[in-house]
């Protein structure tokens, strides 16, 4: 699909009139508008629709990003309906759908096959659908942009679900020294460890309790679980045993500063906010969706 599809310099012929009317930036959707959806449940905390919509409006892209609150029970039916709409070009998945979405892809990127979940699905020429997962790539780029050193790092990852699995696999492709995994569902942690061992020789440990056997050697501690979304949630792990140089990262975007990050800051530790992952994954996702030429990433701020 050409870039002009997404720009609002499209002219439309008005029935019964001879002049051409240029579509206004704030005009409602028209018959040429391309649609993208974000599937999640709950969806209220997800920042991506606001950020994508802001960019689409700023750069006059004739496209809409629509949030869809879809629970697991209705997921397959809802996604099948969306895929059946000819003017839908892509879908983004957040919790809890990243594993379930895989079977809806006709083609998977090599990265998605290794990770075992997807957060992006796009319509290809001919009508087939391709899945990819850019969460981990966005996290790694964001961490590096924040000045956090990964080479030789000891990393603790709390949560091995859809986003955790992507982050864990992506970190293992970097030159880290050790990766400790924990999930309340131990089978998910062991499954991620096994997937990583197929592609990396990094030292991997599966912890039997939150925080792992010894946090005193941890350089980067990451929460990739839902803990912190809701007020009153328990901390995913204690920051008390982390060394003074450690960095604490959270993938949760709203609230921006979670209880875990508050505790880490109070303990004098550097923190890394969840919105960094989205901000650095967006250019990759835009390219995947064919929108990269519609946005000026050099001049765009994607702060959510």
Positions of the model-derived regions?
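Short, conserved loop/helix-junction motifs that constitute active-site signature segments
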Residues: 29-30, 150-151, 175, 237-246
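Conserved S-adenosyl-L-methionine
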Residues: 173-178, 267-270
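Rossmann-like adenosine-cofactor binding region
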Residues: 203-272
């Amino acid at each position: 699909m050409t870039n002009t599809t997404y720009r609002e310099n499209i002219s439309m012929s008005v029935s019964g009139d001879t002049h051409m009317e240029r579509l206004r930036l704030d005009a409602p959707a028209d018959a040429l508008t391309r649609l993208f959806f974000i599937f999640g449940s709950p969806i209220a905390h997800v920042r991506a629709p606001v950020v994508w919509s802001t960019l689409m409006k700023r750069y006059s892209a004739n496209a809409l990003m629509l949030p869809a609150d879809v629970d697991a029970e209705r997921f397959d039916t809802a996604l099948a309906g969306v895929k059946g709409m000819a003017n839908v070009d892509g879908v983004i998945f957040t919790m809890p759908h990243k594993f379930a979405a895989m079977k809806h892809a006709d083609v998977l990127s090599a990265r998605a096959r290794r990770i075992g979940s997807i957060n992006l699905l796009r319509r290809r020429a001919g009508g087939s659908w391709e899945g990819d997962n850019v969460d981990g790539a966005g996290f790694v780029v964001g961490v590096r942009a924040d000045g956090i050193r990964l080479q030789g790092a000891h990393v603790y990852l709390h949560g091995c679900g859809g986003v955790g699995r992507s982050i864990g696999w992506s970190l293992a492709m970097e030159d880290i020294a050790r990766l400790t995994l924990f999930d309340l569902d131990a089978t998910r942690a062991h499954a991620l460890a096994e997937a990583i061992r197929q592609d990396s020789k990094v030292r991997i440990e599966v912890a039997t309790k939150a925080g792992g056997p010894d946090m005193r050697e941890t350089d980067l501690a990451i929460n990739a679980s839902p803990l912190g979304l809701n007020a009153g949630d328990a901390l995913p792990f204690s920051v008390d045993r982390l060394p003074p140089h450690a960095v604490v990262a959270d993938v949760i975007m709203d609230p921006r500063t979670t209880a875990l990050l508050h505790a880490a800051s109070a303990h004098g530790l550097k923190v890394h906010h969840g919105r960094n992952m989205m901000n650095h994954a967006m250019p990759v996702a835009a390219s995947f969706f064919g929108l990269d030429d519609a946005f000026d990433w050099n001049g765009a701020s994607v702060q959510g």
